[in-house]
């Protein structure tokens, strides 16, 4: 899937987890909005999530993911299990299968990418990015990770600023959430 119009990044470092995104919404070649919020806190602020793709589809997926997390009878928050369960449903369900979005979800211990093709990816490094500017932000973040003085929030902000300079579908109106 190749979504135009956003860049979302997730980073873990020094006990902090950050998900950040730009604010641009495009329709074709037109910028419709520059200050959209594409990330949110779920499960009473214990999980961060961000999306690239259709907004209405992403909201549906956020709700489904949160349902999966909360469905455990033992009350344990297990985003890996919830992500796999959501990916299975997303791939198999006739209605969900048509949703066009990708998600990043993160808690204090994990960062995951969930796609509609059934993929659940845990990055090798403590950083992952999606969307049209995702590769630019990811590359910049990997370079910034070498500077041990930078926090997860600093790295996310700087990486998105670089993506905004290169990707025409990404702007520098950055929204950032942090847990940990």
Swiss-Prot record:
Known catalytic reactions: ATP-dependent cleavage of peptide bonds with broad specificity
Gene Ontology terms describing biological process: proteolysis involved in protein catabolic process
Gene3D superfamilies tied to this protein: Glutamine Phosphoribosylpyrophosphate, subunit 1, domain 1 (3.60.20.10)
Keywords associated with the record: Allosteric enzyme, Cytoplasm, Hydrolase, Metal-binding, Protease, Sodium, Stress response, Threonine protease
Residue positions binding Na(+): 164, 167, 170
UniProt-annotated catalytic positions: 6
Subcellular location, record wording: Cytoplasm
Stated regulation of activity: Allosterically activated by HslU binding.
Pfam families: Proteasome
InterPro entries (UniProt xref): ATP-dep_Prtase_HsIV_su, Ntn_hydrolases_N, Proteasome_sua/b, Proteasome_suB-type
Enzyme Commission numbers on file: 3.4.25.2
SUPFAM superfamilies: N-terminal nucleophile aminohydrolases (Ntn hydrolases)
Protein origin, superkingdom: Bacteria
Annotated GO MF terms: metal ion binding; threonine-type endopeptidase activity
Cellular compartments per GO CC: HslUV protease complex; proteasome core complex
Matches recorded under PANTHER family: ATP-DEPENDENT PROTEASE SUBUNIT HSLV, METALLOPROTEASE TLDD
Function: Protease subunit of a proteasome-like degradation complex believed to be a general protein degrading machinery.
Family listed: Belongs to the peptidase T1B family. HslV subfamily.
Summary of subunit composition and partner proteins: A double ring-shaped homohexamer of HslV is capped on each side by a ring-shaped HslU homohexamer. The assembly of the HslU/HslV complex is dependent on binding of ATP.
The name this protein goes by in its record: ATP-dependent protease subunit HslV
């Amino acid at each position: 899937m190749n979504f135009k119009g956003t860049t979302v990044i997730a980073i873990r470092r020094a006990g902090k987890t950050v998900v950040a995104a730009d604010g641009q919404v495009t329709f074709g070649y037109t910028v419709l909005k520059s200050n959209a919020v594409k990330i949110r806190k779920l499960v009473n602020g214990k999980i961060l999530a961000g999306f690239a793709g259709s907004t209405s589809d992403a909201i549906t997926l956020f709700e489904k993911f949160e349902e999966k997390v909360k469905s455990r009878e033992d009350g344990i928050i297990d985003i890996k299990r919830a992500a796999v369960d959501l990916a299975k449903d997303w791939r198999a369900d006739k209605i969900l299968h048509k949703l066009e979005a990708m998600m990043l979800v993160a808690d204090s211990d994990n960062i995951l990418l969930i796609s509609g093709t059934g993929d659940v990816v845990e990055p090798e490094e403590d950083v992952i990015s999606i969307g049209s500017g995702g590769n630019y932000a990811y590359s910049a973040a990997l370079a910034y990770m070498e500077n041990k003085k930078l926090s997860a929030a600093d790295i996310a902000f700087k990486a998105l600023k670089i993506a905004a300079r290169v990707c025409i579908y990404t702007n520098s109106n950055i929204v950032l959430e942090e847990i940990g």
